[in-house]
Design a protein with these regions (language model features):
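C-terminal transmembrane module of eukaryotic multi-pass membrane proteins
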Residues: 335-339, 364-368, 376
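Non-catalytic N-lobe/flap surface of aspartyl protease domains
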Residues: 21-250, 296-329, 351-369, 393-394
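C-terminal helix/juxtamembrane-tail motif
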Residues: 381-394
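Flexible, small-/acidic-enriched active-site or ligand-binding loops
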Residues: 239-276, 344, 350
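Generic recognition of flexible, low-complexity loop/linker segments
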Residues: 275-278, 314-316, 377
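Fungal secretory targeting signals
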Residues: 1-26
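Active-site beta-strand/loop microenvironment that shapes enzyme catalytic pockets
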Residues: 113-121, 273-298
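Histidine- and/or cysteine-centered catalytic micro-motif in compact active-site loops
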Residues: 233-235, 243-247, 259-260, 270, ...
């Protein structure tokens, strides 16, 4: 399945940014494949691989935080090497097809254009070896700084950091850092050939002297302001706005909450069905994932939930005729998830899969709030005022 996702960029019109394109530049993005086969049956292998990737991403992020900040992250839950498997309480067979799902769009380094996933849960820009050839760019520079980042089931991105000219939606910046992996860490996942991080620098694996790509755009005044806004939809009309807030994407008021950039993540206090949680807002994760014990506690309040486990992930199914009630409260505002947002495909017994999961070995005391929630709200990420804004989609 392909889905058009457009970038709308708020551009600087001053002469100092003469290279900037006109306002309302748009790029078509694709929703990278799907976790579902015909009949909306969930692909268990693709999904558990994705969950493993998320787990490894956060383990790396906490290690990066300690190296960059000289202390453990306040959310640290487990020893990073601990891969305990507490299991689930049953098994439901799921159909295995070969598809996956993330949001991807085009960027350009050194005049070379390739697809990349936009991830508010990480900070570095990493690409596969064939996506970018530094030798083809007249302004590329090998810094000889080495990087290494775990990505999935034993898959690792590793290589050297280059700096080069960067462009996205007509917005340009010079000397932006890109990790050119010598090994393929994203396999068979066109159109994406890399990851572009939108979290804060304190969790980046690159040395501190390199800033994430959006910070580079901001420092070089390629954007009017340090804000970006995700509005993701299951059909057409999904957007990522850079450099401004587009009020046409939401209705009603925007609820703002403060964010501490020193912690690296887009992190806020929240409640899910009244249960207090720490929530990391992560565009690079598909569902809502929490520590297994906390997820079990939340699900106890729902009727008709059948647990199953796969690959260290505890999930649930429910009768499709009786969708559970789930709402997430942020900043005192309840955002109720709709029937379609709570549908994550079918198990082969005909029941619906619930898009809230417990993850064994999750290295921190926080929930990862992904695409399931993104499709209910328009989210404003404000690096100028260190805050996030949430509003119901228009």
């Amino acid at each position: 399945m392909q889905l058009s996702l457009k970038f709308v960029a708020g551009l600087v019109l001053a002469s100092s940014a003469a290279f900037a394109a006109e306002d309302n530049v748009e790029i078509n993005l694709q929703r990278r494949n799907s976790f579902f086969s015909t009949g909306n049956q969930l692909n268990v292998n693709a999904f558990t691989t994705h969950q493993s990737q998320v787990n490894n991403k956060y383990k790396d992020a906490l290690e990066n935080f300690k190296r960059n900040m000289g202390r453990d992250h306040p959310l640290l839950r487990l020893l990073l090497g601990d891969k305990r498997n507490n299991g689930g309480s049953g098994t439901v067979k799921l159909t295995d097809v070969q598809q996956e799902q993330l949001w991807a769009g085009d960027v350009s380094f050194g005049g070379q254009t390739f697809g990349i996933d936009f991830d508010t849960g990480s900070s570095d820009t990493l690409v596969n070896p064939k996506a970018y050839d530094p030798k083809k760019s007249k302004n590329s520079k090998n810094t000889h700084d080495y990087f290494r980042a775990a990505y999935g089931d034993g898959t690792t991105a590793k290589g050297f950091i280059y700096t080069d000219d960067f462009e996205i939606a007509g917005l340009k910046a010079k000397n932006v850092a890109i990790g050119h992996s010598v090994s393929e860490f994203i396999q068979d996942q066109e159109p994406s050939q890399g990851i572009a991080g939108l979290a804060f620098p304190s969790i980046q694996s690159f040395p501190k002297k390199y800033t994430p790509f959006f910070e580079a755009l901001k420092k070089q005044k390629a954007v009017n302001s340090g804000v970006f806004q995700f509005t993701l939809k299951p059909g057409k009309g999904s957007t990522l706005v850079l450099g401004k807030v587009d009020s046409s994407k939401y209705k009603g008021k925007v609820t703002y909450v403060d964010v501490d950039p020193s912690q690296g993540f887009w992190l806020t206090d929240a409640k899910i069905n009244g249960q207090k949680i720490k929530a990391i807002i992560d565009s690079g994760s598909t569902i809502i994932t929490g520590p297994t014990d906390q997820v079990r506690s939340m699900v106890k309040g729902l009727k008709g939930m059948t647990p199953f486990s796969s690959g260290g992930t505890l999930m649930y199914t429910y009768d499709c005729k009786n969708t559970p009630n789930v709402s997430i409260n942020i900043g005192g505002t309840d955002f109720k998830l709709s029937k379609s947002q709570l549908f994550f495909g079918h198990a082969n017994n005909g029941q619906c899969v619930f898009p809230v999961a417990g993850q064994d070995g999750l290295p921190m005391e926080a929930w990862i709030v992904g695409d399931t929630f993104f499709q209910a709200v328009s989210i404003i990420f404000d690096t100028d005022k260190n805050r996030m804004g949430f509003a119901t989609q228009a």
